[in-house]
Amino acid sequence: MQTSMSPVYLPSLSERHFRRIETTRRPCKFILAGLGVASLAAFGISAHAADYQPVHCAVHAAYVGSPLHAPVDITATPPVPNKALPAETTRRLDVTYERIQAFTAASAITAAVAIPGKGLWQQTSAPTDAPRLFWASAGKTFTAVVILQLAEEGKLSLDDPVSLWVPDVPNGDVATVRDLLAHTSGLFSANEDLKAHADPRYRDPAANLAIARRHGAMFCPGGRWRYSNTGYDLLGEIVRKVDHRSIDVAITTRIIAPLGLTSMRALVPGGGAVGVAPLTAVHEKPIDPSWAGAAGPIVSDAADMTRFWAALLGGRLLSDGTVRTMARKLYPMFDPGTYYGLGIMVFDVTDDSRSIRWIGHAGGTPGASAVVAYSPSDNAIVAVALTGDAVSVPAANLLLKALGPPK
């Protein structure tokens, strides 16, 4: 079952649109330019064990959730040349960046707008000894790309049961690698455990899986959609077993080094975050970015993030067919207008009475917010990451609007 675009309004610039909304019982909720997305350790929602009864499933379930989005066609984009955008465009982006800095009051921020085939604008304000920013769940796309590369190489199948690679996973004989990528496995996300959330320390994938086992599966694989950071933990473990290297080494070897992304780094899970702008939050103690593991492994400036997405959309990391597969089956997420495929998000929104579609990924955790997205109507890739209690999506929208009317 499919549905047409479900619009969400992207408001104009005002200070309140950059601020998170605090809730009484759930960790913290942001306004993503009108998109209310709950956040806990990079997109999670606080849950109690009593919220559901664990299920044991013998077969993969038919999807019974809210209507799917129609497949989104991803057209290959040319590379981004290493040159500046026209002077007037650069001036407008610079002015917009200054406004964003003032409204967000971010202690560190990096932003970039890349136009494939034309050029790049970028600005970063960060400590000189910590110039990289944390991209939180926007780094999930990197983990997904490695898994999809391994599938193209015939080293695994997206339809492999998870139990083929990782033992003792709830419904692991039924849930597939594809389910982990799409968040349809039913696997409990360990960061939703209230006791674990209150215990600020690194937990490796085995510890997170133990928490997920204790809670049990939330639904039969394929039957519904629910975000699971632990599912991406398991994808990192699958990479380790199939590719014989950790997720950080696999991302570096397969993506960062070949593309020459000199500012970008894949963090060693639990290995600390030296050289990364400190996360700052008023109401909740931030995590060490390296604790996110395969669920959010990337630190970088915004320019390299746009270069990665240009390479992905341009077929330089995966075949065009595989890239299209990432947006073929799109599940509705937390809010109207947001959908999830295989390691990517689709945003369908409205702004000033015009429809906007973004293809990318957002991320958030206490003390950091990030988004990277390709806007087909603008033929541009925008990326923003910042620290503090503000949010990144309104900033990204303002930067795209500074380019002028959509093409």
Q: Where are the language model's segments positioned?
A:
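Boundary at the C-terminal end of the N-terminal hydrophobic targeting segment
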Residues: 47-49
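Short, gly/Ser/Thr-rich active-site loops of penicillin-recognizing serine hydrolases
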Residues: 51, 60, 65-67, 349-354, ...
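A short, well-structured edge-of-sheet supersecondary motif
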Residues: 94-129, 135, 197-199, 344-347, ...
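Short, surface-exposed loop or secondary-structure junction motifs
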Residues: 173-364
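Short, well-ordered beta-strand elements
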Residues: 369-388
